[in-house]
Swiss-Prot record:
Example of a GO MF term: acyl carrier activity
Protein transport as UniProt keyword: no
Gene3D superfamilies, per the entry: ACP-like (1.10.1200.10)
Keywords on record: Cytoplasm, Fatty acid biosynthesis, Fatty acid metabolism, Lipid biosynthesis, Lipid metabolism, Phosphopantetheine, Phosphoprotein
SUPFAM superfamilies per UniProt: ACP-like (SSF47336)
Protein name: Acyl carrier protein
Name of the gene this protein is made from: acpP
PANTHER family: ACYL CARRIER PROTEIN, CARRIER DOMAIN-CONTAINING PROTEIN
Primary localisation category: cytoplasm
Annotated function: Carrier of the growing fatty acid chain in fatty acid biosynthesis.
Pathway membership: Lipid metabolism; fatty acid biosynthesis
Naturally occurring in which organism (per UniProt): Chromohalobacter salexigens (strain ATCC BAA-138 / DSM 3043 / CIP 106854 / NCIMB 13768 / 1H11)
Chain positions with O-(pantetheine 4'-phosphoryl)serine modification: 37
Amino acid sequence: MSTIEERVKKVVAERLNVKEEDIQNTSSFTEDLGADSLDTVELVMALEEEFDTEIPDEEAEKITTVQEAIDYVVAHQ
């Protein structure tokens, strides 16, 4: 089984069409990985599906980096 970090990075890579090796925990979805607002919505939906969880809109708005996504998933497993 992959770690949460590996799974988050895989989802990010697939959704944002970037290489996993180019994704750092500190990477910002918009500034470093080139996501626009639609990409971030789709990314949150993909994370919800991958981890079988629901991320409320007000929480989703706070998730702007890879590490924040990892932290959210860890806290809500």
